[in-house]
């Protein structure tokens, strides 16, 4: 994973999600502004919308890594239907105490 995503930063964190839909948020506790997400499964919808200065960017292609700035830009998922949706998110995070706070915060948005 490190070779595929060299600009994520340290420590490299991976989160596996199943059927997760997140509300609008920023990943404020990430150590780096760079995050990646990859989608897997057979489903409809479920796109990740990233609010960038140039306009909204919609990420949906499956089985590829999508690079986005999760710390700097608001982002959220659209609802999905018709099957199981998996995603893997790669990012770096600041410290153990913040890791616990991040996990708790994401329970409120995802």
How should these model regions be labeled?
Residues 42-45, 49-110:
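Catalytic core of Fe(II)/2-oxoglutarate
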Residues 1-45:
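Conserved double-stranded beta-helix
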